[in-house]
Amino acid sequence: NSSGTAYTTLATILQIFGEDKGWDYMKKLHANINTYTKSGSAPIKATGRGENLIGICFQHDGVKQTKKGLPVVTVSPAEGTGYEVGSMSIIAGARNMKEAKKFYDWALSPAIQTMVFTSGKSLQVPSNTKAKADPDAPDLSTINLIDYNFKVYGDKSTRASLLSKWDNDVSVIPR
């Protein structure tokens, strides 16, 4: 319940297969999971150390392990995959609105995003399409991205409901 990566995986599977088939798939997948982690990048790190055969993760985390020299190959499901969108917001009525807007514009500028995303430390894709990504970052044009429903699956009550169903119907199944 603590990993956003795990929730994105669950939401993706439910969107691809539909609720009934998606939950059936999750129950079958559960039997093959070695460890559930609290960190979204932990499964692929364990895979790199040889503790798991497969690690479900965001692509940039897999590529990062490969760049470290670990025996990890990153692939995307042919059925499609969900994704994350890094974002930032300004709180309505902020005391320092002018400065907040300045920082916002600065952080999202092509120059700053190019600097951050080509430093070799982050293999995520910049949110500003005019910024350059690290050459090793995943090429989203080669990946079958689903039409992820952020409105539905980003809703707090939907998330709580799905995680409750996971706790009650999937996590209790013996492995």
Language model segments and positions:
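Extracytoplasmic ligand-binding site segments that recognize negatively charged/polar headgroups
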Residues: 1-51
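A ligand-binding cleft/hinge motif common to bilobed small-molecule-binding domains
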Residues: 53-71
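Mature extracytoplasmic/periplasmic domains
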Residues: 82, 86, 91-147
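Conserved C-terminal helix/tail region of periplasmic/extracytoplasmic solute-binding proteins
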Residues: 147-175
